[in-house]
Amino acid sequence: MDGQSEHVGGPSVREELIAIRERWHCMNHPFYDRLSEGELELRHLAYFLVQHSLLVRQIFRSIGVTYAKSPDDIAHFIVENLAEEAGLLGIDGGEAHDHRDLIFRFTRHSGWTDDDVRNAELLPTWYARAAYYWWITDAEPPIVRIAVQATQESQLVGENGARAVPALIEHYGFSENSPEIGFFTEHATADVKHGDILLDLVEKHATTPELRARALRLAEQTCKLRWVSFNELYRVTHLGEEVGQAPE
């Protein structure tokens, strides 16, 4: 099989993962529609970054377990990705940025104190996403975790490149070089590379029909959960609803 995923006719596993991502792509969510219209408050976009930062903290801790279980090429990607996230390595030789610092630039501009960000809690569906990553890491082969991640990181390209950055420039007074929106501009391009590498790894290591089917199933479940987490984010921010409250 020369290390490629086994399938007879039909789409490749790469093509199927891309189709799953596009079907559930959160750049099509009403949250980003309101942003593109200039109707979303900046503090609500900042709250997305707060939730994202808390989630990523758990994702990267759990992926350390995946690193320990992975073949060398997957392990190398994980180390490089972690180094870029922490600002120890620039993307494609560019300037290195700690992504937490990029987030703080925008949250400070939007009225959040650093303590507010650090002391925030994950919304219930975002907490469920974190727990789901830990479960996949514990229960599934490393390549299933990589397939899941392939459908998640690459969504940031569309969300930021097609929706967030143009909206922030058109409606909110920023320029493409405004340091406050550095998180959005960097992720409009950085995750193209990451997504391609992840898809290549899945093509190489999802070598049986059973492994391929499992990777696709859990990738779609993760995409659905991401969409649902944006539903909750949208409801508690733009719609101002109280969700997840204990009954009286």
Where are these regions (language model features)?
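Alpha-helical bundle segments that constitute or directly flank the non-heme di-iron/ferroxidase center
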Residues: 21-26, 40-72, 144-164, 226-230
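Histidine-centered active-site/metal-ligand motif
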Residues: 29, 52, 95-100, 187, ...
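Active-site-proximal alpha-helical scaffolds that flank and shape metal-associated catalytic sites
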Residues: 8-15, 19, 76-183, 224, ...
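C-terminal, helix-dominated tail/subdomain
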Residues: 107, 186-190, 203-228, 242-248
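Helix-loop segments that flank and shape redox-cofactor active sites
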Residues: 33-41, 59-83, 164-176, 207
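Short alpha-helical hairpin
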Residues: 14-41, 59, 166, 235, ...
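Transmembrane alpha-helical segments of integral membrane proteins
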Residues: 195-203
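Structural helix-adjacent loops and short alpha-helical linkers that scaffold large soluble proteins
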Residues: 67, 71, 111-117, 209-216
